[in-house]
């Protein structure tokens, strides 16, 4: 689905908010350290990556509403294709934790959060070309305590 400019910017803002919230949640669960918390922490990390990629989709005027559509977006937009292997690794780790009840250790969460940072670094430059206010939005979100 194609978005008009106002909806695109609103989508960028919403997805960046979800990105920041999921990173913060993953970090909180990591600090908790309980086995179930660690499994959900890698899932939150995956969803952080998903939302920063979807912020880019929104900036391009494209609404992605499923994982399948997300895969098509990667194929149709090679400028962000470098993100796909890292994104896919996060997705697989999340699915292992959620669907197969695979045990996670703190280092798995730390690795997942590093992968999220890699996705952010790769996507933000592209995102700012289409939504120059994205960095300001992200800075404001990170500077605001979220509860």
Describe each PLM feature range.
Residues 1-147:
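Terminal alpha-helical segments
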């Amino acid at each position: 689905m194609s978005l008009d400019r106002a909806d695109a910017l609103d989508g960028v803002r919403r997805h960046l908010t979800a990105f920041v919230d999921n990173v913060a949640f993953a970090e909180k669960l990591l600090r908790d350290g309980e086995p179930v918390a660690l499994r959900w922490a890698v899932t939150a990390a995956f969803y952080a990556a998903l939302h920063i990629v979807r912020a880019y989709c929104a900036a391009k005027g494209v609404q992605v509403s499923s994982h399948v559509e997300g895969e098509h977006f990667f194929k149709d937009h090679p400028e962000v294709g470098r993100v796909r292997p890292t994104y896919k690794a996060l997705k697989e780790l999340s699915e292992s934790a959620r669907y197969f009840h695979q045990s996670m250790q703190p280092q798995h969460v730390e690795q997942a959060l590093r992968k999220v940072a890699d996705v952010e670094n790769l996507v933000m430059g592209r995102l700012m070309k289409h939504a120059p206010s994205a960095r300001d939005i992200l800075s404001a979100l990170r500077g605001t305590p979220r509860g």
